[in-house]
Amino acid sequence: MSATTNSGARIAGTGAAGFKPVVAMSHDFLAQTAKLPMAVHAKVLKWAMAFQIDPTAPGINYENIQSRDPNLRSVRIDLDWRGIVHKPERGNVYTLLYVDHHDAAYAWAKNRKLAINRVTGAMQVVVLETVTSVEEAPPVAALVEVPEVFPGGQGGANTPWASFEGLSDQHLLALGVPEDLLARVRRIATESELDGMQESLPLEAYEGLFLVGAGDSVDQVLGSRETRVDRAIDTEDFEAALLKPESQSRFVVVTDDAAMAAMLNAPLAQWRIFLHPTQHKLASGSRSGPVRVLGGAGTGKTVLAMHRAKWLAENATADGQKVLFTTFTKNLARDIEDNLKSLCSPRTMEKIEVKNLDAWVYAFLRARRYPHRIVYGRKEDAGAKAAWSTAMAARDSSLDLTEEFYDEEFDQVVLAQGVSSRDEYRAARRIGRGVTLARSKRDAVWPVFDEYRQQLSTRQLKEVDDAYRDATALLETEAAEAKASGKVSTQVYSSVIVDETQDFGTQSLRLLRAMVPCVNNDLFFVGDGHQRIYPRNRAAMSKCGIDIRGRSKKLYLNYRTTAEIRNQAVALLEGVDVDDLDDGHDELRRYKSLSHGPSHPMIQVDDLAAAIDETVRYLKNWREADASLNANDCVVSRTAAVLVRSTAVRSAIEQRCKSEGMSTVVIDKDQMMTAAPEAVRFATLHRAKGLEFDRVIVVGRRSALGDLEETAQERRLLYVALTRAKREAGLILF
């Protein structure tokens, strides 16, 4: 079988006999490189560069080793360090698999083999443990006991689980299970036993088995992957295998010295190189219309969106056009732009514009001499406060409605739905508002909102949602005029990528629809309703002119947050209704964390002073643990963040930490994430959105654990904050 893509193209620089051999590096090889001492790292880089130039050179001494794979070889780096390489029996693909001390490298290679799955065609490093039953398999490395049954799908031995015993070889292979592991997989009886095999299984197999165990059919899993498993596979053609998305999730082809040096010098930034097969397929290829990708916290939605922007800029964007990448806050936009610059070439970045939507609207309207100043918070804006006070003075006192009611009604009904007249207000949906308003009462309430808008207009002010509506109208008018006159459209974007979609309301989605024509690859959304921290922004795409039917996907694997942190966060949302961004329902049952770590029980204290004491205790314990590791030459550099509900609480805790001799930094809209790793980060729960840290302490109010309907929003905030953590998280309530 020839190594071809769907279009018939071969891997660059390979093909006919005599062409330069193909050199690939595995995920494990790069991960090991990241751990090497500096002096050894330099030697590995020099050796790997020479290997990339010509892996068949006489100076490279391949040594036979004891391994279950007869094609694995050891290559000397210096007296003590060895590289493990797959040297093909036929073909021209040489694969760097591992690097370590002599004995450790040999031990790693002993029970491993590089094989091609005969159904999927993917390259897989298979771990052939010398065990005869699942019971002897190594257990999951967990420091605490996992609950027996837990909402969210990551439970213990008693969690309902489907058996794999009746699945055919073809089905298991199609899910990604290596042929050598079929018998062991069939004996798995619980989710915990599947976790015990996690290190032995390719990622796509682990995910597929988890979904089948949780209740999905094999056909459902394969259908969601859009994977063909009906083609003949040559299990010796590694060149063809490298073209499979499953292979590219763990192997990368090295094309030149510069590429190899870049990867080896920044091995921790593996998100730039490896994508899960599902992410890879979503990031590449043409789509016939808008795409929506859902995924819980830590599932790689933003990484996927960045890779999608790169692919579109390089493959589907004409000269003179751009891909717009937009998100909710300025901090996130700056962080994404920095990451895109490390992912994309300067030429590709010329075709990508990154801007949060508020900033985009401001620039767009200003360029068209918009006569109004946009109000982003009426309670903080002097002009808006005066306009609101005037409107409140005109309300009908006989209705017995509070000012808070009017404030929330205007936000959650009038602005959210773009209501601009009494008749539209009569027909507006008011689900979840808690107060029933008959038609006569709506007629009596409406003049207050009408008066407020008139008062704003006299002051040349506009609420942000109304400004968005004006921007949408201008875009639609400009497009219609260009079409009527036969001129080229003034729309400069070929595609729009939207991150944190759950926090964009109806007017935002309608604006995004108007930014780009209805063509292939027009809109790409990633989001998660569980992380909506602005309740007024719940919207349905289908009611904003965005049709995602047949183009909706989901990411299930959590790469960031440990199972223990995720379980604690998910428990807060048990019973909370969550939408799928299009008036449907979403759930967390099938999400799965790939890592385990320490678990800390929720702490409830009486007051802020006690909460501060507990926060300082956490930080000191973490600092002492890191110091102990560093004393043993295990250099660690782990970030810690304290996330709180208000700036007042933030200031109080920060001052105490400073008095304890800790360096601190406050993350706000103007503060970039550039502080030294040892500095404790401080942020409000809202400001922490989209960020990640090694360790997190969340300080909230005990009232967040009250009635579900009344506390749903506070629970979402705590969920978002806890899932910013990669290794450890503590929740303190006062």
Annotate the PLM regions.
Residues 32-35, 269-274, 394-398:
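Short amphipathic alpha-helical boundary/capping segments
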